[in-house]
């Protein structure tokens, strides 16, 4: 999109992923809405800024392949409550629980309550 060499795209990717490494997935009420929509916007901005940095000659100190490996390891080591279960993080706050209650009522498992 911006031009540049393949090496710059690798640095842009490494910079972008490094900035978001360890970000939890905590959808309120199990819905990909709160806080996901805003995080997607922030992620888009992060990607564009990382691309601009790489095109300006900023290089990731950690090679992109190692950043990807680290991302995999971090993701596997995150507690289950922080991996899109709707149980931890913002989903587990009193307000997050109240939103879930308002949407789904007393359903124990809102994701599977419609089957």
Roles of regions detected by a PLM:
Residues 2-115:
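Functionally critical mobile loop/hinge segments
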């Amino acid at each position: 999109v911006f031009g540049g060499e393949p090496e710059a795209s690798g640095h842009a990717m490494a910079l972008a992923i490094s900035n978001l490494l360890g970000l939890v997935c905590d959808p309120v009420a199990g819905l990909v809405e709160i806080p996901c929509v805003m995080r997607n916007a922030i992620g888009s901005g992060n990607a564009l800024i990382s691309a601009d940095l790489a095109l300006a000659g900023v290089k990731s100190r950690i090679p992109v392949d190692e950043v990807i490996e680290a991302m995999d390891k971090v993701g596997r080591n995150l507690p289950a409550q922080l991996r899109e279960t709707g149980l931890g993080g913002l989903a587990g706050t009193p307000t997050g629980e109240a939103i879930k209650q308002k949407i789904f009522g007393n359903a124990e498992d809102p994701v599977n309550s419609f089957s």
